[in-house]
């Protein structure tokens, strides 16, 4: 769908409903909701938001776990001219309080489950914990918004320090949906299974890609990811495509995949963090006929930069850039120029100037492009470990460790060291019992002397960020209280 006039996301929703009509569109916890029910609710809630005083440009925080209420709330906010400000429901009151203080929202939307946390965090801000109370009989006409007006303020950076508000415009999100559709659409691919948190930029991308689908797509939505339930739903609903993050795929590999009929599953889209090549190979072997489409994006690029094209994946890469997106490598760092690049960081003009230079977004990720334009992610620039003057990328070490059959997941960090500057430390979870000393020896056999982890900590589970990434910050903190095996 091409834009004629301002790329207002509320207008996109209107046009999408007009084109598709009313049909069963969203399944959630045993109930199908129709597109008409969803669209009508968003119109009525938009009227309630306007009655509450929400005007063009106002931020509205949405702290609701996955449910049909989330896309309805987003569409209502856009219709009222507001700025969607998602908050992951796992935030503490202190974390949410910092977000609210920074965003200065007009309103917070939540559910009774989180009312206590929100009330503690949102002092002086009106809170509504039942979307139904906002529904009005009348429908609110779309409040005009232009391409460059803010559509979403998405907070990111939980693994890198203080969270930053990423300003995404209506044009950013419209084009992310369009480019994502153009890069990945397969005719007849209509049945999806979604477990991504809709408060994350990846989940927001999936919603916007869906609005550009030319047919009548149907989606099964999970409140949260649970591997056995995911497999049961994929089998029951004969899901054809499922977006996940790597930690979800690793958990699926621990399940008896062969016991489920996944014959209709054609594509698993994976992003948000690097995916180990060994995990890809194992999933492909155990689920014949599926294709894993690994992609790459940041919140700062509307969650999209590149993706492996259907039928032409190059495993180990994240594919070529999507349409209208340029990538260049500067001193090893991935830089992006695109209509997907954010307007900037909220209340952070200096950081914005540092991150976007001469129209190029400096991502902080290290990577390389091959001769065909496929992008490979090497690691996060800030996660680079320098041991004895040698650069060590954690992902290289993790990939080597994951070759051991007893290691289920791995995450590598650096800790300060008086002799070498930094020492390499690995945290692993196991699928079978083995001594940490044996794992250190295994790493030494496969990695250079400067590169193998001298310490390996066996843990029951890796700490994860709210969006399923291994939390390196938490692991570094663990090093101060937990001993390890050193050789």
What are the language-model segments listed below?
Residues 174-191, 199-240, 255:
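Conserved AMP-binding/adenylation subdomain of ANL enzymes
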Residues 6, 22, 138-155, 162, ...:
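Conserved pre-ATP/AMP-binding loop-to-beta segment of ANL
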Residues 2-6, 14, 22-67, 71-75, ...:
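Conserved AMP-binding/adenylate-forming core of the ANL superfamily
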Residues 320-324, 331-355, 392:
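Conserved ATP/PPi-binding loop(s) of AMP-dependent carboxylate-activating enzymes
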Residues 32-37, 151-178, 308:
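Conserved AMP-binding A3 loop
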Residues 239-244, 255-313, 326:
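Gly/Ser/Thr-rich phosphate-binding loop
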Residues 51-52, 79-137, 141-143, 430-432:
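Structural core segment of the AMP-binding/adenylate-forming
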């Amino acid at each position: 769908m091409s834009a004629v006039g301002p790329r207002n996301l509320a207008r996109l929703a209107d046009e999408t409903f007009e084109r598709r009509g009313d049909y069963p569109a969203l399944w959630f916890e045993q109930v199908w909701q129709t597109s008409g029910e969803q669209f009508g609710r968003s119109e009525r809630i938009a009227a309630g938001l306007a009655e509450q005083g929400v005007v063009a440009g106002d931020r509205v925080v949405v702290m609701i776990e996955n449910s049909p209420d989330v896309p309805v709330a987003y569409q209502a906010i856009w219709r009222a001219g507001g700025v969607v400000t998602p908050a992951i429901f796992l935030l503490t009151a202190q974390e949410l309080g910092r977000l609210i203080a920074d965003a200065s929202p007009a309103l917070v939307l939540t559910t009774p489950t989180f009312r206590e946390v929100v009330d503690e965090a949102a002092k002086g801000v009106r809170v509504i914990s039942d979307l139904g109370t906002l529904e009005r009989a009348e429908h609110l006409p779309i409040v005009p918004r232009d391409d460059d007006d803010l559509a979403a303020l998405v907070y990111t950076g939980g693994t890198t320090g203080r969270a930053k508000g990423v300003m995404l415009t209506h044009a950013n999100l419209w084009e992310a949906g369009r480019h994502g559709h153009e890069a990945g659409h397969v005719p007849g691919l209509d049945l999806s299974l979604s477990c991504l948190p809709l408060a994350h930029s990846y989940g927001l991308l999936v919603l916007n890609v869906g609005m550009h689908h030319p047919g009548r797509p149907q989606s099964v939505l999970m409140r949260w990811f649970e591997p056995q339930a995911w497999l049961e739903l994929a089998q029951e609903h004969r899901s054809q495509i499922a977006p996940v993050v790597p930690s979800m795929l690793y958990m699926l590999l621990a399940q008896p995949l062969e016991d489920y009929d996944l014959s209709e599953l054609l594509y698993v889209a994976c992003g948000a963090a690097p995916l180990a090549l060994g995990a890809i190979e194992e999933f492909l072997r155990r689920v014949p006929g599926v294709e894993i489409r690994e992609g790459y994006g940041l919140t700062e690029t509307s969650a999209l930069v590149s993706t492996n094209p259907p039928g032409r994946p190059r495993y180990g890469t994240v594919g070529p850039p999507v349409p209208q997106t340029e990538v260049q490598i500067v001193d090893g760092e991935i830089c992006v120029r695109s209509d997907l690049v954010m307007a900037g960081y909220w209340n952070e003009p200096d950081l914005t100037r540092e991150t976007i230079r001469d129209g190029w977004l400096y991502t902080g990720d290290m990577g390389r492009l091959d001769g065909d334009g496929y992008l490979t992610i090497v690691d996060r620039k800030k996660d680079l470990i320098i041991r004895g003057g040698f650069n060590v990328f954690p992902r290289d070490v993790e990939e080597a460790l994951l070759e051991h059959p007893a290691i289920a997941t791995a995450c590598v960090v650096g800790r300060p060291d008086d002799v070498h500057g930094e020492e390499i430390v690995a945290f692993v979870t196991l699928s079978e019992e083995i001594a940490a000393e044996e794992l250190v020896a295994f790493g030494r056999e496969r990695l250079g002397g400067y590169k193998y982890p001298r310490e390996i900590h066996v843990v029951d589970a890796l700490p994860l960020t709210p969006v399923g990434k291994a939390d390196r910050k938490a692991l570094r903190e663990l090093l101060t209280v937990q001993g390890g095996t050193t050789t």
